[in-house]
């Protein structure tokens, strides 16, 4: 059973009419960045469609992702200096059963992704996005380790 101790909601804004083949990169996410005395380990991610996430929490004028966009998007995550998770279909990250959207019934948590570089991670489109700007909301579950001694790390 997964237990959530730390959670961060991250929104990836998709411009209207994003062309096929385009990549939309994440912005810097300070809360989820490793620092000299802090390590972040991502344990799981979820994505929410507009039926469960209607509008952006940052600016409620941008709508949530329509279910029809899901088949157009694949995710690539840059971990430990390489694109270690490449072109994962977005549907793999949807864990809520919704008649309008594909989802993964028995999902597999990530293998504790440490050193995930959000600035180099992106969504790639195999078809043009809708004519309306929207956000893809990612629910990030993670562990934060703080340095206690020269070689000792403890969960914070």
Which residues fall in each region the model found?
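Beta-strand-centric surfaces of beta-sandwich/beta-rich domains
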Residues: 1-156
């Amino acid at each position: 059973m997964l237990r959530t101790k730390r959670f961060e909601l991250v929104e990836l804004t998709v411009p209207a009419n994003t062309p096929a083949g385009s990549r939309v990169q994440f912005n810097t996410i300070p809360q989820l960045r490793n620092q000299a005395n802090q390590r972040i380990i991502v344990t799981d991610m979820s994505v929410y469609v507009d039926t469960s996430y209607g509008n952006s929490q940052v600016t409620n004028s941008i709508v949530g992702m329509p279910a029809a966009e899901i088949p157009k998007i694949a995710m690539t995550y840059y971990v430990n200096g390489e694109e270690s998770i490449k072109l994962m279909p977005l549907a793999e990250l949807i864990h809520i059963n919704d008649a309008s959207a594909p989802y993964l019934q028995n999902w597999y948590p990530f293998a504790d992704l440490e050193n995930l570089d959000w600035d180099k991670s992106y969504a790639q489109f195999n078809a043009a996005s809708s004519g309306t700007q929207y956000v893809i909301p990612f629910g990030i579950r993670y562990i934060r380790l703080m340095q206690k001694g020269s070689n000792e790390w403890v969960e914070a």
